[in-house]
A protein has these predicted regions:
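Periplasmic alpha-helical coiled-coil/stalk elements that build and connect Gram-negative outer-membrane
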Residues: 2-3, 10, 30, 138-249, ...
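Gram-negative bacterial Sec-dependent N-terminal signal peptides
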Residues: 2-23
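Bacterial Sec-pathway N-terminal export signals of envelope proteins
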Residues: 24-76, 82, 109-110, 225-265, ...
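Amphipathic alpha-helical coiled-coil segments
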Residues: 48-63, 137, 141-162, 171, ...
Length: 453
């Protein structure tokens, strides 16, 4: 019975061990979408601009509070020394009483030259601008994650090609050594094969170093080690048909342009706000007070007021007019920044489009080159085996094929990255991956508001 239990436990343990690698592979596998999402959600740059957005949300709440009444309470008590006519009329030179007073005031805005309206309008625009800055930063960080992800895949493919190249050169060395031992070759061929093998091993070592650098970059950007990465594909329907369509989409949708547009709206509201200084300020002020034992009198006083109060500055040294001119220049500055951003986004989009086209053409050219080199290598190998081709020609053909395959892999991943770079320039990288932007990137997220928040 004991032997049976022991055998059963061993079988279960063996099954668990066999299943563990499969589970581990599934747990460690990461898609491009997951890598970008992790990078955006954990990157402190995104956190920084998101917190700036939340701070401006609170400034918007402060602006909306200007429409609401302001209520203040005041209470005070303490000894009061009095020597006045009232005290003397009572036949005393002076008197000290414990003065007690309390008051409540309510002030309600009636008209302030549209200052509050402009403040709310400005803060809504600033919230919109901050939200687009969050989205812009998310797109940039997402593109960094895409680049680091593709770099790891590219260098892994290059390592595989370099390892195959080393294996081929080892086979060539074994072949010429066997010939030399059989008396059908010479020592020069052996030395040449050894030298080429060393060169192939050196190339492999260099590519492995490049892979480690790419993995280090991935860890910095994504925050996790790149274990099993899945090859991504760009959906065909998300890439515009031509460069001008791409530029138009970028200028319309790029978060870089959108936050500049919002900055212009904020600047316009600033100008309106400064104009409020040319108008009177009108408020309803309600007040009530209770005072006990004041001015030497042992009695209690009650007061209540309901006033409409107007305040109107007549002269401030020309500061108001100068401030209006200042903010008009600020508005013009914001418009110029918008034009600068539009031009920069258009340039980035055209550069990305050109990179995509060039890399696509390179892929086609290099595929033909690889195919031609494979055919050449195969012919040279057959000729070498029957003594019609020298070893050096075959080794050169092997090397040309290795270099062409390495260049093709680089071109393929360069083309893939160029597509994602184009999407990022249009502000649609996250959408193309099926990702929802973080909450702080939504300009409408602050619309729900309560005066008691």
């Amino acid at each position: 019975m004991r032997d049976y239990k022991t055998q059963l436990l061993r079988s279960v343990a063996a099954a668990c061990l066999l299943a563990l690698p499969l589970w581990a592979d599934q747990a460690q596998s990461m898609t491009l979408k997951e890598a970008v999402e992790i990078a955006i959600n954990t990157n402190p740059e995104v956190g920084s601009v998101a917190n700036n957005r939340r701070a401006i949300d609170e400034e918007l709440r402060q602006g909306r509070a200007l429409y609401l009444p302001q209520i203040d309470l005041r209470a005070a008590t303490g000894p009061e020394y009095s020597d006045n006519v009232t005290v003397e009329a009572r036949g005393k030179d002076d008197i000290t009483l414990v003065r007690k007073e309390g008051s409540a005031t309510l002030s309600q805005l009636l008209f302030d030259g549209f200052f509050a309206d402009s403040e709310v309008e400005k803060q809504i625009a600033r919230v919109e601008s901050a939200a687009h800055r969050v989205n812009e930063t998310s797109e940039f960080i997402g593109l960094d994650a895409v680049e680091s992800y593709l770099e790891v895949l590219r260098h892994r493919a290059r390592v595989e090609i370099a390892e195959n190249n080393v294996q081929v050169h080892r086979q060539r060395l074994d072949q010429v050594r066997a010939r030399a031992d059989a008396g059908g070759g010479n020592i020069a061929d052996v030395r040449q094969a050894e030298a080429r093998l060393s060169n192939a091993e050196s190339s492999l070592n260099q590519v492995r170093g490049d892979l480690k650098d790419a993995e280090a970059l991935f860890i910095r950007v994504v925050g996790q080690a790149p274990d099993t990465l899945e090859d991504p594909t760009v959906p065909a329907d998300v890439v515009p048909a031509d460069v001008e369509s791409a530029v138009a989409l970028a200028i319309e949708n790029s978060p870089t342009v959108r936050f500049a547009r919002a900055d212009v709206k904020a600047a316009e509201a600033d100008v309106k706000q400064q104009n409020s200084s040319l108008y009177p300020d009108l408020r309803l002020e309600l007040g009530g007070s209770i005072n006990d034992d004041i001015d030497g009198r042992r009695d209690t006083e009650y007061d209540a007021t309901a006033l409409v109060v107007m305040r109107y500055n007549l002269y401030r040294g020309g500061a108001d007019v100068a401030r209006i001119r200042e903010f008009k220049y600020r508005q013009a500055e914001a418009l110029d920044r918008l034009r600068v951003n539009e031009r920069k986004v258009a340039e980035d989009t055209r550069v990305s489009w050109n990179a995509m086209e060039v890399s696509h053409n390179n892929v086609e050219i290099l595929r033909r080159e690889v195919e031609a080199n494979e055919q050449t290598r195969d012919v040279y190998k057959q000729q070498f085996e029957i003594g019609q081709r020298g070893l050096l020609d075959l080794l050169d053909a092997d090397n040309e094929l290795f270099l062409a395959r390495d260049s093709l892999v680089t071109a393929e991943y360069t083309e893939l990255f160029a597509n994602y770079r184009l999407l990022a320039s249009q502000g649609s990288l996250q959408a193309s991956l099926g990702l929802t932007p973080v909450e702080a990137a939504d300009p409408q997220a602050a619309e729900s508001w309560s005066p008691f928040d």
